[in-house]
C-alpha cells in the first residue's frame, strides 16, 4: 500500500468499522484482525494500514481515545486515606459545639472550679457557654479538631483496611475477631500518634474567656508551646493510657457496624458501579455506635480528667487508679457516666457523618478511578 499525505476526498473514518485507503476510493471493511477490499482477493493485516491511519489526525485522535488505558489516579490505600481525612474533617466541624459541651460536663466532676455543678444538661451547657463566652465559645478547640481529625481518620482507616485483610488471613472463620483485632490495631496507631493534638483540644475547650483557668492559652500553637515548656513532653501524652483502654470501644463498634452493613444491604451494584444507600448506612452506624458507647463510656471520663491542668494542688489526675477511686468516692457510679446523654447526642451524629461520608467518598473515588477517559 502506498503511503500518502493527502487522503482521497470524502474518504475519512466511516461508521461501522469502515476505513478508507489512500489508494482506493472504495471503503475498506474491518473484519476482526483483517482488512478485506471488496473488489480485491488480497487480504492485508491491520499492521499494514497503521501508518496511513496515523497520517490522518482525526483518525488518530479517535483511535487513540478508544485504545487509551483506564486512568487510575489513586491507589486503594490513597483512596482510603483521603476518604478518612475528608470524613473526619466534616465530622469535627459539624459536632464541635456538642464536643465542647461534652468535655465541660465530663471535666466538672473533680475540678475545684466546678465543685457545685456549673453546667447542667445539654441545652443548659450550651446556653451557659454562649452566655459567658459568646457563640465563639462553642467552637473552642476547632483548630486542633481540624488538625487532629485529618491524620486521625487518615491513619485509622488506612491501618484498619490493611489490618482487616491481615487478620482475616489468621482468623478466616471468625469475622468478628478479625475485625476487632483490626480495629484495635488501627485505633492504637491513630491514638498514639495524635494524642498531643487531643490534649491541646481538651485544654482549649475547658478554658474560659474569663481567664480563670490556671493557664490561659491564646490559641492552638500557644497551647502546644506552653504545654511543652511548662509541663514537659509527658504532658502531651496525658490520658494516653485510658485512651488505649478505650480501644475496646472500636473493637465493639466496627465489627457490629460491618455486620449491620451486610444485614441492612447498604451496598448495591448498578450499571457496573457500586452504589450506597445512605439511609441504611446512617442506621448501621448509629446503632453500632450506641451499643459501643454504652459499654465503654467510662474510659472517656477518665481520659478527659487526666488531660486537665496538673497544677491544681494535690492533683491526682495523672494517675489512673487513684482517679478511678476518687471519682467513685465523690460521685458514685453515675460519675463514670457524667455527660453520657450529651455524648450520645454528639457521637451518634458524629459517627454517622464520619462513616457515611467515608463510605461515600471512597465509593465516589473508586468509581471515578475506574472510569475510561
From Swiss-Prot:
| Substrates-to-products reaction catalysed | dAMP(in) + NAD(+)(out) = dAMP(out) + NAD(+)(in); dGMP(in) + NAD(+)(out) = dGMP(out) + NAD(+)(in); GMP(in) + NAD(+)(out) = GMP(out) + NAD(+)(in); AMP(in) + NAD(+)(out) = AMP(out) + NAD(+)(in)
Transmembrane helix among keywords: yes
Localisation per UniProt entry: Mitochondrion inner membrane
Upper taxonomic classification of the species? Eukaryota, Fungi, Dikarya, Ascomycota, Saccharomycotina
**Which PANTHER family does the protein's record reference?**
MITOCHONDRIAL NICOTINAMIDE ADENINE DINUCLEOTIDE TRANSPORTER 1-RELATED-RELATED
Q: Which Pfam families match?
A: Mito_carr (PF00153)
Chief subcellular location: mitochondrion
The record describes the protein's role as:
Mitochondrial inner membrane carrier protein that mediates the import of NAD(+) into mitochondria. Can transport NAD(+) by unidirectional transport or by exchange with intramitochondrially generated dAMP and dGMP. Also able to transport NAD(+) by exchange with AMP, GMP or deamido-NAD (+) in vitro.
Cellular component (GO) terms are: mitochondrial inner membrane; mitochondrion
Q: Where are the Solcar repeats?
A: 75-166, 174-263, 276-364
Task: List the Mitochondrial matrix topological domains.
Answer: 1-80, 163-176, 257-280, 359-373
GO molecular-function term, one example from the UniProt record: NAD transmembrane transporter activity
**Biological process according to GO:** mitochondrial NAD transmembrane transport; mitochondrial pyruvate transmembrane transport; NAD transmembrane transport
Residue ranges in the Mitochondrial intermembrane topological domain are: 102-141, 200-235, 298-335
Could you identify this protein by its name?
Mitochondrial nicotinamide adenine dinucleotide transporter 1
| Topological relation to the membrane, as annotated | Multi-pass membrane protein
Q: List UniProt keywords, sorted A-Z.
A: Membrane, Mitochondrion, Mitochondrion inner membrane, Repeat, Transmembrane, Transmembrane helix, Transport
Q: Which residues cross the membrane?
A: 81-101, 142-162, 177-199, 236-256, 281-297, 336-358
* Family note: Belongs to the mitochondrial carrier (TC 2.A.29) family.
**Which InterPro entries does the entry link to?**
Mit_carrier, Mitochondrial_sb/sol_carrier, Mt_carrier_dom_sf, SLC25A32-like
